[in-house]
């Protein structure tokens, strides 16, 4: 019987021909080598699939498959998560680069912290041509020594940059990532959900380099792109109403939080998200009623 490695690296690919080689090289050059890479190409129209396939021919740790139709980012990530049968999982963005000690350091932290559900590499931004900056791409969301209620409040208050979502997870958590939710800021919801199930920890040094797309987009253009990529389903209410509702649902479903603490967290979230995302309680209630009563019949 073939022994499975400790870590699966998942890469969701779509038209990344200019950066995919750098991303894969950075993964293959890790000091920690007990991993495999699975690549799901979402119907790229450039040479991304061919480049990935060439890598797979040279290294038997890599497997590549191609979707028959374009699924969109969330569905493609979900396809990747279905193929994980190792203790740990890492989402490798096809645009970014990881330091050679990234896997080693994160796995070491996991192994010495049984309650950790996610260990993310500290990150800085770099330009699209590879110029590394000193600007942090992180948020203060390390939750060591916090109870679950305080973890959730810290996540909701402090999360702005979501690079931490590209960390190493315990694979048992993947079933909880709500990739079927076409809402704004799903990465924030994913981190919030992780904090329900365990600690979020970080490496002590910068081990992740996140490419910063310097795109001059208006909010309307960004929203249009999210709709086109099937990241977000338009609604007549605040774009963040469903986002808030899904946070409430995650809290209410959690089995490790008392009723008293659930109510305290939901009350706090209403205030935090109302300020951060300018979403009113009225929009939250109306969106919930719409989804409950009207949406099933559309």
Per-region residue spans from a language model:
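A solvent-exposed, charged loop/short amphipathic helix patch at secondary-structure junctions
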Residues: 220-232
């Amino acid at each position: 019987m073939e022994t499975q490695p400790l870590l699966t690296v998942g890469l969701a690919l779509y038209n990344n021909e200019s950066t995919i080689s750098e991303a894969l090289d950075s993964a293959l050059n890790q000091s920690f080598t007990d991993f495999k890479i699975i690549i799901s190409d979402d119907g790229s129209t450039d040479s991304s699939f061919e480049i990935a396939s060439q890598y797979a021919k040279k290294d038997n740790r890599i497997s590549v498959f191609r979707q028959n139709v374009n699924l969109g980012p969330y569905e493609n990530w979900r396809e990747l998560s279905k193929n994980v049968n190792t203790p740990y999982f890492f989402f490798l963005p096809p645009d970014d680069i990881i330091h050679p000690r990234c896997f080693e350091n994160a796995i070491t932290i996991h192994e010495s912290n049984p309650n950790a559900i996610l260990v993310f590499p500290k990150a800085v931004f770099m330009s699209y041509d590879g110029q590394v900056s000193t600007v942090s791409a992180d948020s203060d969301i390390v939750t060591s020594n916090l109870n679950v209620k305080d973890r959730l409040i810290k996540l909701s208050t402090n999360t702005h940059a979501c690079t931490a979502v590209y960390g190493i997870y315990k694979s048992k958590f993947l079933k909880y990532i709500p990739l079927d939710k076409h809402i704004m800021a799903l990465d924030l919801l994913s981190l919030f959900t992780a904090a329900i199930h365990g600690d979020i920890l970080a490496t002590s040094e910068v081990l992740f380099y996140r490419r910063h797309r310097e795109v001059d987009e208006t909010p309307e253009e960004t929203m249009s792109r999210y709709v086109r990529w099937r990241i977000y389903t338009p609604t007549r209410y605040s774009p963040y109403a469903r986002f808030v509702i899904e946070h409430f649902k995650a809290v209410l479903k959690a089995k490790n939080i008392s009723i008293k603490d659930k109510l305290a967290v939901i009350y706090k979230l209403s205030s935090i998200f109302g300020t951060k995302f300018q979403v009113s309680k009225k929009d939250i209630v109306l969106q919930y009623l719409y989804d409950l009563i009207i949406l099933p019949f559309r």
